[in-house]
């Protein structure tokens, strides 16, 4: 018996060595050499440079001098390397970048002074409005630019982590949230769970929790199917070291770089697993009809019932297809089901190939992580707080079932793209050599997206933010929490302050536990263990009725009544951007955060490519930002533990929609050019335009430096500029209006869930890009486009009627530059509202040219004679007045 166990352990160790050899890690850069990225193996420029070592060949980033000391020594007394490397922008780029920022600040002040000295007496109201707008533009630019002065990149060293924590990695609880199997297609969710179960992390040291906020039997039975298919998929991933470990994305790749140890078996195993996956997808797609058919059979046997039935012949305790009392959305019991029990600590090798088991797993550890399905109780009269409420329930339930000291959260449409993604944040959390590891509340990864249209029409990749702004915050107190792809320290979620302000255990003991965390003694009893970052997962020995009662209490609606949940504990409530505010609360307490750079990307997800859905998405974000400003989470109210420039960054995040009100009206100013010749924002108008061109050009030059150090492309930057203008002409002003109504009426703002539809039925994965969903939110931007097209037509008409060298003519041409610039920025929106015609951009150009020509012809025919008549009349009145008053002086 002992010999058998020894041989089993030896075989498992050999497999582990083989996998670790295949998944080799570059010790300098932390690059995981494991297959191609989800985007056909393409690397982003910034990742490629850093993973080349950040050394001599890198023309942007340079490694910060870090000595391998600080008391971190191995058993032989040798200094151990740090668990992550820090890079800063080279001075040859950073210093000119900072100088340009200072120069533009001086130019803005000079521009304001010039405008005050040349006050427009003809239209004081117009001049005043534009002056207020320009001052706010300058202020918002300063808020946006100051936090970007010291960008920092941090790259985990997975080889160093393996050397120092090869067998004692701490436990991790992984949270996944979903609501609606229609708006969030269930195929995304099952692939997310499968990628998590197959992650390269000690299988007995992490657990996966799915929160189904809709309480649907479809989601539950999909997880049952996942648990079955994972018995094949996870060992296959371990045997062949496949990347990525989401089956849908893995099988969609045309080529894969093989890193496993048995290449001769890959093709046969690949064919077998792919066939099983296709059958698995068929079962997932047919779940709804299967459950309905089963329920019809059971309901026929029980006259008068219209229930939804589980496979074991019992009523589903959640929502039913036909709503009934206690079985409908917003009113159903809580559910906690352990679908996969916690595995043993010893490896369990699979079976050799046979007729019943075509895939040989004899040398592969076939254990699976713990998998738990959760649907919290919902009752009328309670505000269930959407995603934040679901996350807090998972935080409590996981404390009883696994209580890992670290937590990672995912949206249901994000998957693990890099199998070592759970190891990477540990490099920052566990590096306590005076480098802030113990004071790190969370590690945020960039968000990367699949199936975005090739030109990224609506800036879904948002690289300016993810690779620019977030790296800038990395040089301060850390990035903001972005809602998904984030590892937390559990005690930070409990509202405990960082160790620099006191040990976690002593803080917890000093708290008013019942009033802060609720009445569950079982949950409270887990808190001290959860504060130990060295802790693994120690599951409950028996899930008996008493534990079931505790779990029911923790998922109940009333549990949080009279407690600090949603305010000082867990995810923050009563705000649309609960992610940003939750991260802000931790920063306000003095915690730090880290923005991690790994290659391939740690996680990938989906993004809405439909114009309407994308606009609703940023409406929710901008509305939540304003809610943050007008709440107790205002950055101005934070204490001294918040870094000064971090405060500026949060202030910018919570006020940026306000500036767009002025942008919106600026875009409408050309209307006055259509009405009269007398309205000018500023005189002398030509000099004013030259000032504007200079100030705007400087911000674009600064942007080119950011493009350089952020490693993004010019297309990324241009798309960001375009979509900012699209948001500024409709969405952001709408968010400001919503916030004003909330302040007046006291009623909250409802923001709809972003729909991420699949397009498999059409055969075109970009079909949503050319679908027009008409909503009122589109109207303001359409009006802006019409006004500026008309203004261009009038300008062309003036140049034709008066001559381009006359004062009216050349002023019209100068003004037309502004109108054309606005139209260029709104070009993606115009394509979007064209629907299927958007596939042919030439149609748009022809239509606009015809519209401009028509307006110009109308101006020449009707407007120019009228203006000439007005000018002639004004001249006659002037002569008459002169004859009456006589010569002056």
UniProtKB/Swiss-Prot annotation:
Q: Which residues form a coiled coil?
A: 265-293
What residues bind substrate, as annotated? 411, 413
Q: List the disulfide bonds.
A: none
**Do you know which Gene3D superfamilies this protein is assigned to?**
Spore Coat Polysaccharide Biosynthesis Protein SpsA, Chain A
Major location (coarse) = Golgi
Q: Does the keyword Cell membrane apply?
A: no
One biological-process term from Gene Ontology?
A: cellulose biosynthetic process
For the region Disordered, what residue ranges are annotated? 34-53
One MF term in the entry's GO annotations = cellulose synthase (UDP-forming) activity
InterPro entries in the record? Cellulose_synth, Nucleotide-diphossugar_trans
What Pfam families has UniProt attached to this entry? Cellulose_synt
Keywords of this entry: Cell wall biogenesis/degradation, Coiled coil, Glycosyltransferase, Golgi apparatus, Membrane, Transferase, Transmembrane, Transmembrane helix
Q: Does the keyword Transferase apply?
A: yes
Subcellular location(s): the record lists: Golgi apparatus membrane
Query: What are the positions of the active site?
Result: 213, 579
Q: Which SUPFAM superfamilies match?
A: Nucleotide-diphospho-sugar transferases
Q: What does this protein do?
A: Catalyzes both beta-1,3 and beta-1,4 glycosidic linkage on beta-D-glucan. Essential for (1,3;1,4)-beta-D-glucans synthesis in grasses and cereals (Poaceae). The mixed-linked glucans (which are not present in walls of dicotyledons or most other monocotyledonous plants) are particularly important constituents of the walls of the starchy endosperm and aleurone cells of cereal grains such as oats, wheat, rice and barley. They can account for up to 70% by weight of the wall.
Q: What is the similarity comment for this entry? A: Belongs to the glycosyltransferase 2 family. Plant cellulose synthase-like F subfamily.
This one is known as Mixed-linked glucan synthase 2
């Amino acid at each position: 018996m002992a010999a058998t166990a020894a041989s089993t352990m030896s075989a498992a160790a050999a497999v582990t060595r083989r996998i670790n050899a295949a998944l080799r890690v570059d010790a300098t850069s932390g690059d995981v050499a494991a297959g191609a990225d989800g985007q056909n193996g393409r690397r982003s420029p910034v990742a490629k440079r850093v993973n080349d070592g950040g050394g001599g060949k890198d023309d942007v980033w340079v490694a910060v001098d870090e000595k391998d000391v600080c008391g971190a020594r191995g058993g032989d007394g040798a200094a151990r390397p740090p668990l992550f490397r820090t890079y800063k922008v080279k001075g040859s780029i950073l210093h000119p970048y900072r100088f340009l920022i200072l120069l533009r600040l001086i130019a803005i002040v000079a521009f304001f002074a010039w405008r005050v000295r040349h006050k427009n007496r003809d239209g004081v109201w117009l001049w005043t409005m534009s002056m207020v707008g320009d001052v706010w533009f300058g202020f918002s630019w300063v808020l946006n630019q100051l936090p970007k002065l010291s960008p920092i990149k941090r790259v985990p060293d997975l080889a160093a982590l393996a050397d120092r924590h090869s067998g004692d990695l701490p436990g991790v609880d992984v949270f996944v949230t979903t609501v609606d199997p229609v708006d969030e297609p269930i195929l995304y969710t099952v692939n997310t769970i499968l990628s998590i179960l197959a992650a390269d992390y000690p299988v007995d040291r992490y657990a996966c929790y799915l929160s189904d906020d809709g309480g649907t039997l479809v989601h539950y039975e999909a997880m049952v199917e996942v648990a079955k298919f994972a018995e094949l998929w996870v060992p296959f991933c371990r045997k062949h070291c496949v990347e990525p470990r989401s089956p849908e994305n893995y099988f969609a790749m045309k080529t894969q770089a093989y890193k496993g140890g048995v290449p001769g078996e890959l093709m046969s195993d690949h064919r077998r697993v792919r066939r099983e996956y296709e059958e698995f997808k068929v079962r997932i797609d047919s779940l709804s009809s299967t459950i309905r058919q089963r329920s019809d059979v059971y309901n026929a046997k029980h006259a008068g019932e219209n229930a939804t039935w589980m496979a074991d012949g019992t009523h589903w305790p959640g929502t039913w297809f036909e709503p009934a009392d206690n079985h409908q959305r917003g009113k159903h019991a809580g559910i906690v089901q352990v679908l996969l029990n916690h595995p043993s600590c010893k490896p369990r090798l699979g079976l050799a190939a046979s007729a019943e088991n075509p895939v040989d797993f004899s040398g592969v550890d076939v254990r699976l992580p713990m998998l738990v399905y959760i649907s919290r109780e919902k009752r009328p009269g309670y505000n269930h707080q959407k995603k934040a409420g679901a996350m807090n329930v998972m935080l409590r339930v996981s404390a009883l079932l696994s209580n890992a000291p670290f937590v990672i959260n995912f949206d249901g449409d994000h998957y693990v793209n890099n199998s070592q993604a759970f190891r990477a944040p540990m490099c920052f959390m566990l590096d306590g050599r005076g480098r802030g590891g113990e004071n790190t509340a969370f590690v945020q990864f960039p968000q990367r997206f699949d199936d975005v249209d090739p030109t990224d029409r609506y800036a879904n990749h948002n690289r300016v933010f993810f690779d620019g702004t977030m790296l800038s915050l990395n040089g301060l107190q850390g990035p903001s929490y972005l809602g998904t792809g984030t590892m937390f320290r559990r005690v930070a979620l409990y509202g405990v302050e960082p160790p620099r302000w006191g040990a976690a255990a002593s803080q917890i003991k000093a708290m008013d536990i019942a009033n802060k965390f609720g009445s569950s003694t079982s949950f409270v009893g887990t808190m001290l263990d959860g504060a130990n970052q060295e802790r693994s997962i120690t599951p409950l020995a028996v899930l008996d009725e008493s534990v079931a009662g505790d779990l029911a209490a923790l998922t109940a609606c009333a549990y949080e009544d009279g407690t600090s949940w949603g305010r000082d504990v867990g995810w923050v409530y009563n705000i649309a951007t609960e992610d940003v505010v939750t991260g802000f609360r931790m920063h306000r307490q003095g915690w730090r955060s880290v923005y991690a750079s790994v290659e391939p990307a740690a996680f990938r997800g989906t993004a809405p490519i439909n114009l309407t859905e994308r606009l609703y998405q940023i409406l929710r974000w901008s509305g939540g930002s304003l809610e943050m400003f007008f709440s107790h989470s205002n950055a101005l109210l934070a204490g001294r533990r918040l870094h000064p420039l971090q405060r500026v960054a949060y202030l910018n995040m919570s006020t940026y929609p306000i500036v767009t009100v002025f942008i919106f009206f600026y875009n409408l100013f050309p209307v006055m050019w259509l009405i009269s010749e007398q309205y000018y924002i500023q005189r002398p108008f030509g000099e004013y335009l030259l000032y504007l061109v200079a100030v705007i050009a400087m911000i674009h030059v600064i942007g080119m430096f950011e493009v350089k150090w952020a490693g993004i492309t010019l297309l990324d930057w241009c798309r960001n500029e375009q979509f900012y203008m699209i948001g500024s002409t409709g969405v952001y002003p709408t968010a400001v209006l919503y916030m004003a109504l909330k302040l007046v009426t006291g009623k909250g703002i409802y923001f709809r869930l972003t729909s991420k539809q699949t397009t498999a039925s059409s055969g075109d994965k970009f079909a949503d890009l050319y679908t027009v969903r008409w909503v009122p939110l589109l109207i303001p931007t359409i009006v802006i486009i019409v006004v500026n097209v008309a203004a261009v037509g009038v300008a062309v008409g003036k140049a034709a009627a008066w001559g381009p060298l006359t004062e009216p003519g050349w002023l019209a041409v100068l003004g037309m530059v502004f109108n054309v610039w606005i139209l260029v920025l709104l070009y993606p929106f115009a394509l979007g509202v064209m629907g299927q015609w958007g596939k042919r951009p030439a149609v748009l150009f022809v239509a606009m040219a015809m519209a401009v020509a028509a307006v110009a012809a109308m101006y020449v025919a009707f407007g120019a004679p009228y203006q000439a008549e007005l000018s002639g009349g004004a001249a006659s009145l002037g002569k008459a007045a002169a004859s009456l008053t006589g010569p002056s002086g």
